[in-house]
């Protein structure tokens, strides 16, 4: 193999390791069995959430993970692997959530594992992460909780006002 090819591969691994280091959330899946249209739709959905998906040879994945300090992630790099990741701090659950949705829709998609903020996560932990709503969902839940006491107070005031109107008649 020529030195130029070896240098190009080493550069790719180094660049991918930097992407993995900066990633806030990483999910590794087995995607084999999806059609081209399904993979294209999957990538489009990931792009909308500021996430990326790369299909990389397992040897490169192991080397990049080692350089990124994710050595414990190496055991999941067996068989066909795609790495989904995001560096968006506001939406760290997106890769896990989208991968879990596709795993439910298509039996061929399998979540293998992942990492969150540099900590390796098991398949089960990634699935738990997928159950957490995104930032917008959490904010709407918080808003609902904050509005409840005010709304209940308004109902009580309205009921008191109505009862006084009825007693005045």
UniProtKB/Swiss-Prot annotation:
Family: Belongs to the universal ribosomal protein uL10 family.
SUPFAM superfamilies hit by this protein: Ribosomal protein L10-like
Keyword Secreted: no
Signal peptide (from-to): none
Role summary: Forms part of the ribosomal stalk, playing a central role in the interaction of the ribosome with GTP-bound translation factors.
Disulphide bridges, residue numbers: none
Record's protein name: Large ribosomal subunit protein uL10
Metal-binding keyword on record: no
Cross-referenced PROSITE patterns: RIBOSOMAL_L10
InterPro entries: Ribosomal_uL10 (IPR001790), Ribosomal_uL10-like_sf (IPR043141), Ribosomal_uL10_bac (IPR022973), Ribosomal_uL10_bac_type (IPR047865), Ribosomal_uL10_CS_bac (IPR002363)
GO cellular component: large ribosomal subunit
Lineage, top ranks: Bacteria, Bacillati, Bacillota, Bacilli, Lactobacillales
Keyword vocabulary terms for this entry: Ribonucleoprotein, Ribosomal protein, RNA-binding, rRNA-binding
Gene Ontology biological process: translation
GO molecular function: large ribosomal subunit rRNA binding; structural constituent of ribosome
Subunit (UniProt): Part of the ribosomal stalk of the 50S ribosomal subunit. The N-terminus interacts with L11 and the large rRNA to form the base of the stalk. The C-terminus forms an elongated spine to which L12 dimers bind in a sequential fashion forming a multimeric L10(L12)X complex.
């Amino acid at each position: 193999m020529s030195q130029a090819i070896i240098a190009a591969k080493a550069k790719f691994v180094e660049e991918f390791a930097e992407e993995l280091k900066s990633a806030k959330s990483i999910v590794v899946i087995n995607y084999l069995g999806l059609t081209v249209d399904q993979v294209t739709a999957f990538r489009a959905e990931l792009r909308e959430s500021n996430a990326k998906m790369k299909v990389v040879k397992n040897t490169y994945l192991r080397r990049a993970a080692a350089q990124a300090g994710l050595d414990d992630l190496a055991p999941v790099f067996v068989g066909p692997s795609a790495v989904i990741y995001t560096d968006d701090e506001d939406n760290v659950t997106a890769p896990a959530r989208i991968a879990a949705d596709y795993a439910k829709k298509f039996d061929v998609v399998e979540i293998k594992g992942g990492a969150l903020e540099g900590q390796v996560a098991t398949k089960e932990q990634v699935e738990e992460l997928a159950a957490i709503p995104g930032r917008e969902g959490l904010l709407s839940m918080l808003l609902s909780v904050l509005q409840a006491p005010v709304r209940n107070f308004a109902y009580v005031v309205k009921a008191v006002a109505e009862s006084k109107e009825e007693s005045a008649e």
